[in-house]
Design a protein with these regions (language model features):
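Hydrophobic transmembrane alpha-helices of multi-pass small-molecule transporters
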Residues: 1-81, 202-345, 363, 442-447, ...
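Helix-loop-helix module between adjacent transmembrane segments
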Residues: 5-7, 84-93, 109-116, 121-137, ...
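Membrane-interfacial loop-to-helix junctions in multi-pass transporters
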Residues: 25-31, 75-79, 107-121, 151-163, ...
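Alpha-helical transmembrane segments of multi-pass membrane proteins, especially transporters
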Residues: 36, 52-56, 73, 81-82, ...
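Hydrophobic transmembrane alpha-helices that form the pore/transport pathway of multi-pass ion
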Residues: 106-174, 181-194, 375-406
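Membrane-core helix-loop-helix motifs of multi-pass transport proteins
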Residues: 147, 151-248, 422-454
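C-terminal transmembrane helix pair
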Residues: 156, 204-209, 322-335, 340, ...
Length: 461
């Protein structure tokens, strides 16, 4: 209850302190609103999506943003891409095709040993969480993993298998822009701050190497005490249905179009002279196709059933869209009010520090902060500040923002850190001490891998 009053009180104090200087009204309002939002996001006296409406109400009210600028923030193409991505993921889950992909990958990598079984589940979890939420991935794989544990006589298998699914779901989400909300927050704020855009394929060129390094390291660490023998029989799957095949075809074409829209070679949007094409448009065309293409079944009225219906589509997490829109709104407020320039000027001395040290510090702070706070709320708060700090230090904002976005997916220590951690911990198959012991090492590994990868891959930006 205290946090309910702490938010507006802290905002008022911040406003009074900052507004004493001439011309500081707009920056003071922006900082006050941001502080209020942050406190309510962290302590959640009201739901996080409801808190996300504060910038929408207060920044235009006090003249920091115009209604048109506010609409542009919430109608940003990346907000629309997130909307389309959520609906596509819903169709994939509704069809059941994701379960078949998971079982296929587990069988392909699982082999005939307990250790390889864990790696198989981790590969499936990481791949699926690139395209659907890590929560859905974990919930889908958990029953299969529990069934495998019932048939295993290896007493050391439970915690590595369940932790592997949770950790891989978080790591895999780094791989694509739609894999986890912090990636989209970065892309939205970066676009707003710099006027440039990061394409789907460009993000993957940076992120996939991190996934490919982190995943085997995590697997080797958590399976160090697991037997190399003792295969487990997995549930048999039936033949693919027509609907599953069609959903997978639509999804595969969509992913291919996302990855090839822009790139070093030009991309199809340039070849076809479509300068206004973006990833959100691709997603919406795919969504429309899912509503049109029949699934091969009939509904209760004898009519052809489609691959997607509105009852399924409307169950997407709408609150995430509000949270994302709030982040872009705050970033726009930072720019319009001049607060971004003020922060950048105050942090100019950062340019004297080694780049690797700055990035590692950001990664360390974000990793451990997201152990106790929402990763999307954390990145939404930090992205405008990091962008201003990078500009003040004379570097490209992406050099500070990308490591933060990736690190927000590397909280492995506590059950409350991510939904996959909570879901697997709730099975009661391992203790919180086990998660902390395994997770703290991977947290530090994540800091090291992301810091080095970003310096090597982004250092010439």
């Amino acid at each position: 209850m205290l946090a309910l009053y702490l938010g507006p009180f802290a905002a008022l104090c911040a406003f009074l302190l900052m507004s004493q200087n001439d011309g500081a009204f707009a920056p003071a309002v922006t900082m006050a609103v941001t502080l209020w939002v942050v406190i309510w996001w962290i302590f959640e006296p009201i739901p996080i999506p409801a808190t996300s409406l504060l910038p929408m109400a207060l920044l235009p009210l006090f003249g920091v943003l115009t209604p048109k600028e506010l609409g542009a923030a919430y109608g940003n193409p990346l907000v629309l891409l997130m909307l389309g991505g959520f609906i596509l993921a819903t169709a994939l889950e509704r069809s059941g095709a994701h379960r078949r992909i998971a079982l296929y990958m587990v069988r392909a990598f699982g082999g005939n040993s307990s250790r390889r079984l864990v790696f198989g589940f981790m590969c499936a979890s990481a791949f699926l969480s690139m395209w659907i939420s890590n929560t859905s991935t974990t919930l889908m794989l958990l029953p299969v993993a529990l069934a495998a544990l019932e048939k295993s006589d290896d007493p050391s298998l439970a915690s590595p298998l369940l932790l592997g699914i949770a950790y891989a779901a978080s790591i895999g989400g780094i791989g694509t822009p739609i894999g986890t909300p912090p990636n989209m927050v970065f892309m939205g704020v970066y676009s707003e701050v710099t006027g440039g855009a990061i394409s789907f394929g460009q993000w993957m060129l940076w992120a996939i190497p991190v996934v490919l390094i982190m995943l085997p390291i995590a697997g080797l660490w958590i399976t160090r005490g697991v037997s190399k023998s003792g295969g487990v029989a997995l549930p048999e799957s039936e033949a693919w249905s027509t609907g599953e095949r069609r959903v997978l075809i639509v999804f595969s074409i969509t992913a291919a179009l996302w990855m090839t829209r822009k790139g070093p070679w030009g991309g199809w949007s340039e070849w076809l002279a479509l300068p206004y094409a973006n990833d959100a448009m691709v997603a919406f065309i795919a969504v429309i196709a899912l509503f049109v293409i029949p699934s091969g079944k009939q509904d209760t009225n004898g009519e052809p059933e489609r691959l997607l219906d509105w009852q399924s589509a409307e169950r997407i997490p709408w609150g995430m869209l509000l949270l994302f829109g709030a982040g872009i709104t705050i970033a726009t407020g930072f720019i319009n009010s001049g607060l971004s320039n003020s922060i950048g000027e105050s942090l100019e001395q950062l340019s004297a520090l080694p780049l690797l040290l700055m990035i590692a510090t950001i990664c360390l702070a974000v990793t451990f902060l997201t152990e106790v706070t929402s990763n999307m709320a954390t990145t939404t708060l930090l992205m405008p500040i990091l962008a201003a700090a990078a500009i003040g230090a004379g570097t490209d904002p992406a050099l500070f923002m990308i490591p933060a976005a990736m690190s927000a997916s590397c909280a492995f220590m506590l059950p409350v850190a991510t939904p996959p951690n909570v879901i697997t911990f709730a099975t009661g198959r391992f203790s919180i001490q086990t998660m902390v012991r395994e997770g703290v090492v991977l947290n530090l590994v994540g800091v090291l891998v992301i810091s080095c990868a970003c310096v090597l891959l982004l250092g010439r930006l």
